[in-house]
C-alpha cells in the first residue's frame, strides 16, 4: 500500500505560489525538503508537481525506460528563444534525434582533446588580465569566468573570437542572456494572463531574444562568407548529414542549436568555476592541497594536455563543487505510465511532473554522511567516487538527455582552475562573506568578490615591503591605511591584525591602532586572513585573536592554515607580538589558536617582540591583562624602531565643531550588516520579574539563517547615557562636528555628524575604565584632591573601579574638575561593537524572518548612581518598535551547534533563562517537520528559570503545543518554586533527579546541546560526569576522562555571560 505524499498548506487558486521565493526559488525548495522530507507535492497556479529530494528517489526516477524529460516551467519558456535545440527539444521532435546523432562525435574524447590549445589560449588571457590588474583589484569571478567560458565555446565550437577580455564591459549577448533567463524563471511562476499585460517586460524580453539571435546569425553568416575545413561543431551542423535518416539540419534548427550551445555551453561552466573558487577560499586545507598538486604536476611550466589526467585533486575539487552546488540544481521528468517509486511507497500517475531537487539529493546524509553539507574533495578520491550508489551524483543530468557537453566543460574547467592556482593565491574581498545565490535557469554565487595575489617563491607567505597585502574591502570596513592629516610626517609602518567573531579582539586591535600615531607609527588595521598569503615585513606585526572551541575565528582560518603549512624558517625578517583572548570555561581549547600562532611564527624564524599576552574573558581582570600587555608593547616598539613618542593623548585625533545641524549620518560600519525591520516586540515575563522579550525581525533581502545561528545587532547607547556625556562637555545634541585622524579610526572621519549620533552609535560609553584610562585622567589638569582620589582608585583598581563598573563618564561626573577635552575623551573610548544573540526560530517557520529571545539588563548601578545600569544592546532592543530599522547580520554559530541532518536523531537540551533561544529554534524545526509527516527523534529539554508564573518562557504557547505534539519532554527547574519542579532548584539538579529518563539516549546517537552562562555549562558537565561515575563505577578522574571521550562530536555548548 502506498503512502500519502505530504503537501504544504495552499491558497485557493494560487496553490503554493506564496511558498516559493521569487528571487531565489531554490531556497524555498530546500527548506520545504527539510520540513517535508524526501518527497512532497506542490500546486503552482494549477500546475501540480512532485518534488523528490533524496538520493534514493533521484535514482528511482533516473530511468529512461520509465521516465522522460519534461519540458515545463522555466525550460519551456527558454524555447521562446532556442526552439527545438538539443537542450529544449521534446524527445519526439525529429530534430532532437538528428542533432544528437550529428553532434555527439563533436564532444567525443578525440575532439575535446583537439580543443586544448584554444582552451589554454583563453585561460591564459584571464591569467594575464588578473596579473595586470594586480592584487589590489577587486575581481568579480562570476563575470570574468563568464567571459572565459563564453569565449571558449565560441572559439572551440564555432572558431569565432568574441574577444571579451578586450572589452570594458561584458558582451551584449551576456546581459541579454542573463535578463532573458531571469524572465523565463519568473514567467514560469506567473499567471499567463498577468504576463500578457506586462508590456514593457515583454518588449525587453523580445529585445533580449533579438540580441542573442543576432549574434548566432552573425556567427553563421561569418562562416558562410569564410568557409573552413575545420571540423568544428558549426561545420558539422552546416554540412553534415544524419547517418540514420540522411537529413541535414534546417537553417532554423542550426540557429537554435547555436544559441543553445552559446547559452548552455558557457553558463554552467562559469558557475562551476565560481563556486569552486569560493569553496577553495573558504576551505584553506583544500586550497593548500590544490596548490601542492599543481606545483607538483606543473611546476613552473605551462600546462600540457597530458597533465590533465594527473590533476586528480583538481578533478575531485570540481566533482565536490558540483555535488554541493550543481549549477543546474533541478530538473524535471514524467513517467510514461503509472508507476510507484521508493520501493513501492509512493504512487506517481502517468505524465505527472516530477521535479528532481538535485542540490538537496546530492547532500543526502545516507549516501554522503553527516558532513554532507561540508566541502571535502577527498570523498571523490581513491575509488570513493566510483563506489557511490547508482545515480547519486548527477549534476549533468541523466541518460539520453544528460548534458552532451560534459567532457568539454570538464576539460575547460580543469585547465582554467589549474593555471589560475599555478599563478595566484586568492583571498576574499570581504573576509566575512558567506555564500549567497543568484538564480536564473542556473545558479551562481552572488556578491562574491576576491583578490588574486601573485604566488612568488611557492609556498610564500612573505611579501616585499612595497606589496599591498590588504584587500580593498578590508580597508573600507576598518578604515585601515587612512592617509595622515595634512602636514604630518611619514611614520614607521606597523600592522595590527585581528581574528575575531564577537568583536572583542577587533576592539582591542582598534585600540592599539588608535594609539600608534602618538608613538610614531603609521598603523594599518586588518583581519588575519587579509594577509594570509603575504605578510609585510617593513614593520612590526601585532596580532590580537581568539579561539572558538579550539578553532580560529572566521576571518583568521585561512591565515592559520597557511601559517601552519610553512616549512623551514621563511619568516626570519618578520617581528611580531601576539595577544590572545579566551574563556577558561573552554579549558580544553583555552588560548589554543593564539598559542599556535605565537609558537609557529617563532618556529618559522620570526622574532617575538614581547611575550604572548593572555586575556581571560571569564575573569574580572580581562581588560587589565590586555592593558598590561599593551603597556609592555608600547615600551618595546618605540625603542626597537627608534620612533618619537608624543605625550599629548589627543595626538592623531582632532574634533572640530562646525555649527548646528539636523542631519544624522547612517554609517554601516560592520561589513556584513544590512537593514532589517522589526515586526514584533513583546514581553515574555510577568511584571516584576527580570524582563525577557520576544522580538521578531524581517531579515535584509537575500540573508538566510539556520536554527542555531546568531543574529549580530549593531546597537545604540541608551539615550540617558548620551545625554550625560553631552551635559558633561556642554554640547547640544544637534551640534555638528568633524573628526580628522592621522591613523586608522572607527570614528566617522572627514564629514559632519551630530554629537548625539556620534555618541549613540560609534563608541562604548559604559565599559569600565581601564587602569590606563585612570592614569590618563590623573595626568590631566585637576585639583590635588581629585588627583589623590584617582591615585587611590589605581591602588585598588580591581575593587574600586572594575568591581563597581566605573566608566570614564562616571569618573568625569564624580570629579567635575578634570579638564579633559572632548577629543581626548573620544580617543579613550572603545569603538561600538556588535552583540550576537542566538536566533530562537527556524527558517522552516519563515525563511525571511527570525526571532530573538532576549534578557533585558537593568540593574542597580554598582557605581552608586541613582539611575539603574542599562545594558547597551538589550536596552536598545527592548525599545524597538514595529517598523524600526536595525543594522544586523546573520552569523553562523559553531558548526557543531546545529541540528543533525537526520531529524530522527534524539536531542538532549539544557538551557536557563534566555539560553532557551536556540533550543526554541531547534524544537520549532522539529515540530514543523513532524507536522509535515516526518519522523522525528525524541527530545528532552531541561530548562531553568525562577518560577512557572514569572519566567517560564513560552510555557503557555510554543512549548505547551510542542509537548502535546510529542516533539519534546519538558523537565523544568524552578529556583524559587522547588515544589513545582520535583524539589530541583537548578538545571543540573533536575538532570540528576531525572537521570534514568536519559537511559539509552546516548546509545541511540543523541546530540547534547547546552546554552546559558558558564555556571550552567559547568553544572551540566559535572552532573553528566557524575552520572558516568555512578553507572560505570569510575573514579572522579576516570569519569572526567570518559566524559571527554564520549562527548567528542556529540556535545555542543553556547556560553554567554
Swiss-Prot record:
Q: Which positions in this protein are listed as binding FMN? A: 500-504, 578-610
Q: Which InterPro entries match?
A: Bifunctional_P450_P450_red (IPR023206), CysJ-like_FAD-binding (IPR003097), Cyt_P450 (IPR001128), Cyt_P450_CS (IPR017972), Cyt_P450_E_grp-I (IPR002401), Cyt_P450_sf (IPR036396), FAD-bd_FR_type (IPR017927), Flavodoxin/NO_synth (IPR008254)
Residue ranges of domain FAD-binding FR-type in the record: 671-900
Q: Which cofactor does it need?
A: FAD; FMN; heme
Q: Which reaction does it catalyse?
A: 2 oxidized [cytochrome P450] + NADPH = 2 reduced [cytochrome P450] + NADP(+) + H(+); an organic molecule + reduced [NADPH--hemoprotein reductase] + O2 = an alcohol + oxidized [NADPH--hemoprotein reductase] + H2O + H(+); dodecan-1-ol + reduced [NADPH--hemoprotein reductase] + O2 = 1,5-dodecanediol + oxidized [NADPH--hemoprotein reductase] + H2O + H(+); dodecan-1-ol + reduced [NADPH--hemoprotein reductase] + O2 = 1,6-dodecanediol + oxidized [NADPH--hemoprotein reductase] + H2O + H(+)
Protein name, as recorded: Self-sufficient cytochrome P450 monooxygenase CYP505E3
GO molecular-function term, one example from the UniProt record? FMN binding
Enzyme class label: oxidoreductase
Where does this protein hold heme?
A: 403
**Pfam families in the record, alphabetically?**
FAD_binding_1, Flavodoxin_1, NAD_binding_1, p450
Q: What is the lineage of its organism?
A: Eukaryota, Fungi, Dikarya, Basidiomycota, Agaricomycotina
Query: Which residue ranges are recorded for the region named Disordered?
Result: 465-488
Q: Which domain of life is it from?
A: Eukaryota
As recorded in UniProt, its EC number(s) are 1.14.14.1, 1.6.2.4
What are its GO cellular component terms?
cytosol
The Flavodoxin-like domain extends over: 494-634
Q: What does this protein do?
A: Self-sufficient cytochrome P450 monooxygenase that catalyzes the regioselective in-chain hydroxylation of fatty alcohols (C9-15) as well as fatty acids (C9-15) at the omega-1 to omega-7 or omega-1 to omega-6 positions, respectively. Is also able to convert naphthalene to 1-naphthol and 1-naphthol further to 1,3-dihydroxynaphthalene.
Keyword check for Disulfide bond: no
Which keywords label this protein?
FAD, Flavoprotein, FMN, Heme, Iron, Metal-binding, Monooxygenase, NADP, Oxidoreductase, Transport
Any binding details for the cofactor? Binds 1 FAD.
| Family statement drawn from the similarity comment of this UniProt entry | In the N-terminal section; belongs to the cytochrome P450 family.
